[in-house]
Amino acid sequence: MSLLTRRLKPYYEELLEPLVNFFGKYNVSPNLITLFGLFLVGLGSFFLYLENLILAFLLLLLGALADSIDGALARRLNLKTEFGAFLDSTVDRFSDALPFTALGVHYASYGDETGVLLSFLALISSFGVSYTRARAESLGVYGLGGVFERTERWIVLLGSILLGLLKLGLFIITLGSLITVFQRVYETKKALEVKR
């Protein structure tokens, strides 16, 4: 967990508490919230492709909120399961990919090679962040952090959409993600050497 995530998490969870209470009151399935969040991100990505930045921002923000609520709701209802965790992680990868893919296709339709390159660099590097953690954990190395994790990626993505600075946002996401990948590779190497 990054420093920013650690500091913001308590305040963020407090803000989400009324929503968690509402869904908990009606016993809404956390997995349903997970899938609905993916639907919202998909819809938001479609509007991002259409360059309707206001609708894209609102839908992607709601999708990100749904992704935050599902875990808290599962804990509240005591419905935490291995499948739920697996589904959440799987859906997260699709949610990460959809906005970058939408931007890549959008830029390609205008023949904007720089935009296409930045979109797919952001996609690949963000997947690298997720993969290094998953692979390290399969080797028994846990607790990997980094300066630019999923929370930071989404903050930059949403901020760049709101400000209309999409290419700058993609560049920051790519750079931050690559730094985090190298951090995790280095930390994993050190941890595995200690285990020998």
Swiss-Prot record:
Q: Which GO terms describe its cellular component?
A: membrane
The similarity comment for this entry is: Belongs to the CDP-alcohol phosphatidyltransferase class-I family.
Q: Which GO terms describe its molecular function?
A: phosphotransferase activity, for other substituted phosphate groups
| InterPro entries referenced in this protein's UniProt entry, alphabetically | CDP-OH_P_trans, CDP-OH_PTrfase_TM_dom, CDP_ALCOHOL_P_TRANSF_CS
**Protein name (database record):** Uncharacterized protein aq_1480
- Is Transferase given among the entry's keywords? yes
Which Pfam families does this chain map to? CDP-OH_P_transf (PF01066)
GO biological-process terms attached to the record: glycerophospholipid biosynthetic process
Disulfide-bond pairs as recorded: none
